[in-house]
Amino acid sequence: MTISRFYRILLALCGLVGVSIQIHDDGWGMLLYYTVLSNILVFSSLIFFIIYDFKKGDATTNTKLLRYKGGVTMAILITGVIYHILLAPITEPEKFWTLRNFLVHYIVPWGLVLDTLIFDAKKAFRLREPLYWSLFPLSYFAFAL
């Protein structure tokens, strides 16, 4: 097993555990939150990439998959950055220092960024793709209003 596969399996498990704890503790209504949706997007995408790796070869060289992963990375990075800047300072300490909080707001977002920077092929993106990647966050923003 390659290091990238092992890393993605660990990261997918972190996302799955974090989302599972949130849903267990706070109910199915958590599925309406951007944090949970973006973490589900991450772990389901990572599971797909892992299966792709086993069946067809290295997913990190497939430019279509990397472009999709760029969008997933942008979506989860928004989760991490917005939480850290806007919400973490006002979160009560007993809610901040929990496993689920660190999994969904820090470990999975920054873990996927590291995965992208370390394992993915370089220069796989086109200049206009960040515009496409912003569709998921903007759609959620419209939904939230």
What do these predicted ranges mean?
Residues M1-L145:
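Aromatic-rich, lipid-facing transmembrane alpha helices and their immediate juxtamembrane interface loops
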